[in-house]
């Protein structure tokens, strides 16, 4: 990224993204099933750069439903560049974690789908649309059945995400 693009992304963070990218420390949550399914998340590895080199993990929901999947980033050559919103969030990780010790960051995307068991029997008390609505509502409480994750995600991070989702690999 050119310097003016970096400045644009920082302004974008402070003006728009700030407040919608709240990290959840993995140490503070046992079960990621409470998160909304079919959303894009980043799992972040934050490693202190000072003497202790302490490592912490967090999850950040990418606010794509608010800002869209792509962000137009202007450039000095007159062309607009397009960035994935999750890449913008990755770039802004030092701003998101600004009140913490200086660190290096690794972030990888994942999303999961919860089970929505829908039994379509011939119950005359409910119409098909009511049954589908009940199935969609039960999905909020369902167990994750599928996880999609960045192919570059290190194995140890995959294990952390899968364990917190109670999903076998």
Task: Outline where the language-model segments fall.
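N-terminal non-catalytic structural scaffold regions of very large proteins
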Residues: 1-169
């Amino acid at each position: 990224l050119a310097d003016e693009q970096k400045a644009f992304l920082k302004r974008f963070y402070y003006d728009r993204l700030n407040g919608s990218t709240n990290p959840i420390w993995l140490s503070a949550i046992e079960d990621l099933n409470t998160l909304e399914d079919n959303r894009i998340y980043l799992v972040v590895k934050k490693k202190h750069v000072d003497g202790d080199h302490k490592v912490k993990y967090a999850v950040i929901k990418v606010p794509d439903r608010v800002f869209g999947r792509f962000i137009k980033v202007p450039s000095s050559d007159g062309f607009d560049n397009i960035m994935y919103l999750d890449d913008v969030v990755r770039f802004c990780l030092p701003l998101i974690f600004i009140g913490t010790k200086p660190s290096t960051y690794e972030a990888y995307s994942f999303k999961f789908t919860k089970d929505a068991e829908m039994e379509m029997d011939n119950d005359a008390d409910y119409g098909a649309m009511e049954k589908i609505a009940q199935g969609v509502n039960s999905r909020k409480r369902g167990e994750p059945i599928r996880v999609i994750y960045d192919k570059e995600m290190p194995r140890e991070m995959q294990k952390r995400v899968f364990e917190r989702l109670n999903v076998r690999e």
